[in-house]
Curated annotation (Swiss-Prot):
Disulfide topology: 62-104, 92-156
Protein name: Ephrin-B3
Region entry Disordered, spans: 168-225, 254-298
Subunit structure of this chain's protein: Interacts with GRIP1 and GRIP2. (Microbial infection) Interacts with nipah virus and hendra virus glycoprotein.
Function statement: Cell surface transmembrane ligand for Eph receptors, a family of receptor tyrosine kinases which are crucial for migration, repulsion and adhesion during neuronal, vascular and epithelial development. Binds promiscuously Eph receptors residing on adjacent cells, leading to contact-dependent bidirectional signaling into neighboring cells. The signaling pathway downstream of the receptor is referred to as forward signaling while the signaling pathway downstream of the ephrin ligand is referred to as reverse signaling. May play a pivotal role in forebrain function.
Recorded name of the encoding gene: EFNB3
């Protein structure tokens, strides 16, 4: 028997898993978007346009007003941020059942929502994006608490507060220039809004907002990339080993020898009702073993029809084979004397 191998199936599964892990490691964090009127990029010529690639992450942040931070506006602004398609974003309209990303309604907390650009999301409520498609993030309220529920116009029209996401594209049609990962803020969540005020706990309220810690001077430094890459590589090797072990077990089972159980053929049975089970060397008849039983399925003469025609035809179709024996006419046993 040759050495076990995982086979082509195990290699393909391992390669797909490795590619998935490498994709998670290779994604970059884009420059965060601070959502208030103090962000001058909303008034830039051509609008606020980003070119994310599949695997990247983007932070949306609502800066606090109390105490004021480096990105705070003079007065706190209340917004709901929606993810819409290209046509709706150009009209500054959200659908009746909008895809809500983040609600900015807590003046004393920094709130954050992280978007993961992925084609397939493992989360039921996760967002999915297609490469070479355009998406918009818009705010249709007017900045006041009373206008939060508006689904049309708002600051999207009056102040140009919308972000165009050109997924998988580039402004020059080539490779997209990216900043090093060390200059980007660390991603703290998987598609949930976060409070970034240090020393504060989660507060009840909107389900899109959860609290986490963040320094007043900016985002925390990212984790060590060699450590992340090493952990991802170890996970990939573990998954490859599991796939290889499974393939080896399947290969060994295929190579296993067939069962050595022996079933006698129909010719081993005698005529006249004798099943040929007698022992040799003068020994008496022995008991039949499982699989050696002959079953007579016909009558004694040619005129007698078979009393079990079905099993005569398909006797080998169910489990262990059943051997069909043509029974002869009944005979008196020889050498038997009767005492009178």
């Amino acid at each position: 028997m040759g050495p076990p191998h995982s086979g082509p199936g195990g290699v393909r599964v391992g390669a797909l898993l490795l590619l998935g892990v490498l994709g998670l490691v290779s994604g970059l964090s884009l420059e965060p978007v601070y959502w208030n009127s103090a962000n001058k990029r909303f008034q830039a010529e051509g609008g606020y346009v980003l070119y994310p690639q599949i695997g990247d992450r983007l932070d949306l942040l609502c800066p606090r007003a109390r105490p004021p931070g480096p990105h705070s506006s003079p007065n706190y602004e209340f917004y709901k941020l929606y993810l819409v398609g290209g046509a709706q974003g150009r009209r500054c309209e959200a659908p009746p059942a909008p895809n809500l990303l983040l609600t900015c309604d807590r003046p004393d907390l920094d709130l954050r929502f992280t978007i993961k650009f992925q084609e397939y999301s493992p989360n039921l409520w996760g967002h999915e994006f297609r490469s070479h498609h355009d998406y918009y993030i818009i705010a249709t309220s007017d900045g006041t608490r009373e206008g939060l529920e508006s689904l049309q116009g708002g600051v999207c029209l009056t102040r140009g507060m919308k972000v165009l996401l050109r997924v998988g594209q580039s402004p020059r049609g080539g490779a997209v220039p990216r900043k090093p990962v060390s200059e980007m803020p660390m991603e703290r969540d998987r598609g949930a809004a976060h409070s970034l005020e240090p020393g504060k706990e989660n507060l009840p309220g909107d389900p899109t907002s959860n609290a986490t810690s963040r320094g007043a001077e900016g985002p925390l430094p990212p984790p060590s990339m060699p450590a992340v890459a090493g952990a991802a590589g170890g996970l990939a090797l573990l998954l490859l080993g599991v796939a290889g072990a499974g393939g080896a077990m399947c290969w060994r089972r295929r190579r296993a020898k067939p069962s050595e159980s022996r079933h006698p053929g129909p010719g081993s049975f005698g005529r006249g009702g004798s099943l040929g089970l007698g022992g040799g060397g003068g020994m008496g008849p022995r008991e039949a073993e499982p699989g050696e039983l002959g079953i007579a399925l016909r009558g004694g003469g040619a005129a007698d029809p078979p009393f079990c025609p079905h099993y005569e035809k398909v006797s080998g179709d169910y489990g262990h084979p059943v051997y069909i024996v043509q029974d002869g006419p009944p005979q008196s046993p020889p050498n038997i004397y009767y005492k009178v």
